[in-house]
Amino acid sequence: MADKLLDLHQRRDEAIHAGSPRSVERQHEKGKLLARERIDVLLDPGSFQELDMLARHRAQSSGLEERPYTDGVITGWGTIDGRKVFVFSQDFTVFGGALGEVFAEKIHKMMDLALKVGAPVIGLNDGAGARIQEGVVS
């Protein structure tokens, strides 16, 4: 059991640091906040609950050999002034924040949950379009 928990913690750490150190540095050099940093600024401290942190793309196409966690978008919910909101934040450090199949599924799931509870959705966009390697589903 301890091995499985250690594996889960390692995967979670990989997801939190999904972008390469160089891509993180480039974002900061441009004066941009990272996806998680934007969420932290927006929401009440400690309120963010992430959905599907360990999601990865399923594409078999060339050019998509890497399979970082999050698939380029952070999704979840938190509060602003104590009121529940759902949020997604594109992660430019992972695939340039480009839309893919799993990326879209994560946003769709988050929007469905927001609709069920009557909470607003906030999108923090910083992406490079769509991953056409994944075909029409992206």
Cite the ranges covered by each PLM segment.
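Terminal-region recognition feature
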Residues: 1-138
